[in-house]
């Protein structure tokens, strides 16, 4: 089974991917189109034209796992402008899964402690 704690690299295929593709075809997209390879530390995410569903491909050591998520409300904030494989950090992956943009324009800035006296 998939253990997200073991996943170190979250990759998203920017732009559109045909979600009719299965395990073998998506693995071919990863290796041939993007020149990457599947391993136990990497999870690859794909999104079609309808941004309410995504597929994820993961190699678990003895076989592939294909995950499919369809939102009942809302849409994923998926980057569309580039046809590339982009590496996400765990926080950006979490934002994406929560429906937020992976590139937040604003955030609470870190501050310095102030003297109270």
Predicted features by range, described:
Residues 1-117:
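Polybasic/polar functional segments that serve as interface/processing modules
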């Amino acid at each position: 089974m998939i253990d997200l704690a073991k996943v170190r690299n979250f990759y998203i295929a920017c732009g559109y991917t045909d979600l009719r593709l299965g395990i073998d075809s998506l693995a071919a997209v990863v290796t041939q189109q993007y020149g990457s390879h599947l391993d136990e530390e990497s999870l690859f995410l794909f999104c079609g034209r309808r941004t309410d569903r995504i597929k994820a491909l993961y190699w678990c050591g003895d076989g592939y796992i294909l995950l499919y998520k369809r939102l009942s409300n809302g849409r994923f904030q998926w980057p569309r402008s580039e046809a590339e494989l982009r590496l996400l950090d765990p926080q950006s992956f979490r934002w994406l899964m929560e429906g937020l943009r992976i590139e937040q324009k604003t955030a609470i800035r870190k501050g310095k402690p102030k003297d109270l006296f």
